[in-house]
């Protein structure tokens, strides 16, 4: 019993330290780097010179930009042209807010352009990290390759993923995930953030604790993946963990 109690105490300490590290990352000066790039470089350059640089694309009327990330040969980021911190923002459950996940899916074409040939949809994944799982305080969806092992696991669970949010058997990367199948028409009409907030009990009150990802399945449907922060299991809800920015799946 004493050993069990000690182990539990150690886990608590580790969780607190992990939370502290996450908070430290978010309070450093570099946590505003992406926001400054969008608001002070990409947007003004597009408006004044019709040049999106350093972004790959700037769409002021649609409310988003696409930026080549410095990590990985094919990774891009989709970000709003205005201030949204992350998954905790109530703007994401406002129907008037752009459907950023759908826009990010359209932006996957930048991967193919960079690669020099079409990148199969099955190799693409989208991910946004939770408040404690991110290092930047400007909303950004990672557009990148999926890890081959995650791709295989999702393929094997194709029949187990329904149109309701249910636990994904075995989880992913050692963490628990909820999975939900959506059609393309559903995705066009309704943001995954709204699906999560409206369909998962108590999710709306804790949106900042969730990381969210999206992958296309072999039947042309999409699967949404949501993981919630759980510091006792060292899960910071960094949905980006399903991605491989080196794109081994293309080799």
From Swiss-Prot:
Family recorded in the similarity comment: Belongs to the Cdh family.
Enzyme Commission numbers on file: 3.6.1.26
InterPro entries noted in UniProt: CDP-diacylglyc_Pase, CDP-diacylglyc_Pase_proteobac, HIT-like_sf
Official protein name in the record: CDP-diacylglycerol pyrophosphatase
Record keywords: Cell inner membrane, Cell membrane, Hydrolase, Lipid biosynthesis, Lipid metabolism, Membrane, Phospholipid biosynthesis, Phospholipid metabolism, Transmembrane, Transmembrane helix
Superkingdom classification of source: Bacteria
Biological processes annotated in GO: CDP-diacylglycerol catabolic process; phospholipid biosynthetic process
Catalysed conversion reaction: a CDP-1,2-diacyl-sn-glycerol + H2O = a 1,2-diacyl-sn-glycero-3-phosphate + CMP + 2 H(+)
GO molecular function, one term: CDP-diacylglycerol diphosphatase activity
Gene: cdh
């Amino acid at each position: 019993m004493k050993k069990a109690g000690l182990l539990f105490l150690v886990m608590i300490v580790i969780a607190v330290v992990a939370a502290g590290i996450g908070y430290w990352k978010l309070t450093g000066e570099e946590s505003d780097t992406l926001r400054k790039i969008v608001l002070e470089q990409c947007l003004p350059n597009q408006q004044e010179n019709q040049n999106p640089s350093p972004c790959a694309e700037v769409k002021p009327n649609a409310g988003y930009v696409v930026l080549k990330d410095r990590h990985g040969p094919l990774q891009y980021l989709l970000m709003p042209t205005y201030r949204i911190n992350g998954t905790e923002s109530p703007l994401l459950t406002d129907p008037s807010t752009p459907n950023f996940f759908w826009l990010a899916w359209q932006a996957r074409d930048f991967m193919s352009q960079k690669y020099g040939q079409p990148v199969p949809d099955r190799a693409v994944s989208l991910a946004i990290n939770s408040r404690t799982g991110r290092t930047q305080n400007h909303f950004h969806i990672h557009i990148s390759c999926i890890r081959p092992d995650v791709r295989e696991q999702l393929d094997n669970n194709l029949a187990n993923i329904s149109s309701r949010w249910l636990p994904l058997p075995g989880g992913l990367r050692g963490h628990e995930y909820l999975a939900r199948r959506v059609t393309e028409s559903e995705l066009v009409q309704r943001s995954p953030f709204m699906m999560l907030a409206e369909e998962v009990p108590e999710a709306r009150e804790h949106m900042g604790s969730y990381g969210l990802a999206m992958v296309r399945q072999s039947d042309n449907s999409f699967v949404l993946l949501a993981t919630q922060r759980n510091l006792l299991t060292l899960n910071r809800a960094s949905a980006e963990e399903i991605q491989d920015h080196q794109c081994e799946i293309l080799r």
